[in-house]
């Protein structure tokens, strides 16, 4: 809310500016290489070799997206090809779109994208992921499914124009959605011994507590899906309350 259309780097700059006003906050623009238990605390080591000690650790490192290895896809990702219909579907409404998906989520993703465009082409990039019943449902909606392998996405200045298949066939498209593989952006949750859920997220309670005392997780690292900024921010707020509550209880012992 209040930040519709803002670029991620602009949002990040605003957040840093607001946080910097608090004297108790020290922001370090460094990469952490390891986190380990040290008696009743944790030792955090950075890429530069600096060592920090902390009573608690909040993992909010998010996810990394692994895109299908299709030539040109990275050139259009985040510009005219996106992963989240709820984030960018409105901006692509009524255009001829492609849905690139190689897994069991394909049918669901197509149904969601249908809310914004009825001119859809489904590309499974050489994978057979749809049942006959699902194919028939899509056919009745006028949605074509192409299982041939994609070799390239072509366009100009980030705007997708056409798809190229291994058969040399081409299809015109003006945008679309892709289902990337989502992985933890950092290994710290697993390295610290946190329980992971079936989606690869860190298991937490309602206040961000993991199964390891003193370790908390928030945002996409614990939720995995839906991966949205406003949800991640809310999870961060709840985890912060959990950290504060537990530190307060310890201080009164």
Predicted regions and their residues:
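FAD-binding core/adjacent interface of flavoenzyme oxidoreductases
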Residues: 26-95, 202-206, 210
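A Rossmann-like FAD-binding core segment of flavoenzymes
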Residues: 13-39, 43-46, 52, 115-201, ...
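FAD-site-proximal beta/loop scaffold in flavoenzymes
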Residues: 64, 75-91, 180-226, 232, ...
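Glycine-rich active-site loop/strand segments that organize a redox cofactor
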Residues: 1-12
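Cofactor-binding loop segments of dinucleotide-utilizing enzymes, especially the Rossmann-like FAD-
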Residues: 86, 102, 125-127, 220
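Rossmann-like NAD(P)H-binding beta-loop-alpha module
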Residues: 95-116
């Amino acid at each position: 809310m209040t930040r519709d259309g803002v670029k991620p780097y602009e949002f990040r700059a605003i957040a840093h500016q607001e946080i910097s006003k608090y004297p108790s906050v020290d922001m370090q623009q460094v990469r952490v290489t390891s986190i380990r238990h040290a008696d009743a605390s944790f030792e955090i080591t950075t890429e530069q070799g600096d060592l920090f000690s902390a009573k608690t650790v909040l993992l909010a490192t998010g996810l990394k997206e692994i895109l299908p290895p299709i030539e040109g896809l990275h050139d259009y990702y985040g510009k005219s090809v996106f992963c989240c219909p709820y984030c960018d579907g409105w901006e692509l409404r009524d255009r001829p779109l492609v849905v690139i998906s190689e897994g069991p989520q394909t049918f669901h993703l197509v149904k969601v994208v249908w809310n914004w465009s009825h001119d859809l082409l489904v590309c499974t990039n050489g994978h057979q992921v749809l049942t006959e019943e699902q194919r028939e449902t899509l056919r009745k909606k006028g949605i074509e499914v192409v299982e041939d392998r994609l070799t390239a996405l072509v366009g100009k200045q980030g705007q997708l124009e056409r798809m190229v298949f291994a058969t040399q066939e081409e299809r015109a498209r003006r945008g679309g959605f892709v289902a990337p593989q989502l992985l933890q952006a950092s290994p710290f949750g697993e390295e610290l011994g946190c329980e992971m859920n079936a989606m690869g997220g860190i298991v937490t309670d309602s206040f961000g507590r993991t199964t390891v005392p003193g370790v908390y997780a928030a945002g996409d690292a614990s939720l995995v899906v839906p991966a949205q900024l406003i949800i991640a921010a809310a999870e961060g707020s709840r985890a912060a309350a959990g950290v504060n509550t537990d530190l307060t209880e310890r201080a009164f012992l």
